[in-house]
Amino acid sequence: QWMAQSAAVVSFAKDTQEIFVPDSTCYYPGELYMSAHSTHGSITQRLNFTSASTALLRIEADTAEDLLFSGSQWGKDITVSVEQNSVIARHPSGETVTVTFTPNVELAKTDNNYTALVRSPRYPVNVAISFFTSEKEMTANLQNLPSLLNNPAPALQANAERWEGYLTKILRKDMKPEYDRIAVKAVTTLISNWRT
């Protein structure tokens, strides 16, 4: 069962119902990239996997409009709570998804969901999305997220180096470019699916 359709949907705060039109979606080794636009402006999102349990979502927009985050279609058995700077979505099995923001974000619980308001954002806006299999794992890892959100450069560099290492081992100079494309796709798929 899915925990949610999306744990973090971003929009411009002044019109949360406005439809965004996708401009570009790409998956690069180690990064998901998506850009979309509305009449209020464009939003770009980059998702990098910084550890086995956490992905860093970086958001930029072409305007200084306030941003609003919320979850979308939480599963029927999911209980959503807000604790300090984190949204915690718990499943009865013990699995949890957390969405952690920086302290300047105005976080509020609504019904079985949340809103996170970012006023006059300084870009990029960093959000950590994590998946944990137990309360113990969650407690141990949540304390590391403030440093990731405030200084993501080391984690992003480690992510780039990790992927470079994976790809360096499979790319061969004696093979045609088609081989390299297939090899990169295979490694990307295998690593992306390892936790499912």
Model-derived features: positions:
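An extended acidic
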Residues: Q1-S38, A160-R172, K176
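Acidic/polar, glycine-enriched structural segments that form the non-catalytic walls/loops
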Residues: S42-T44, F49-T196
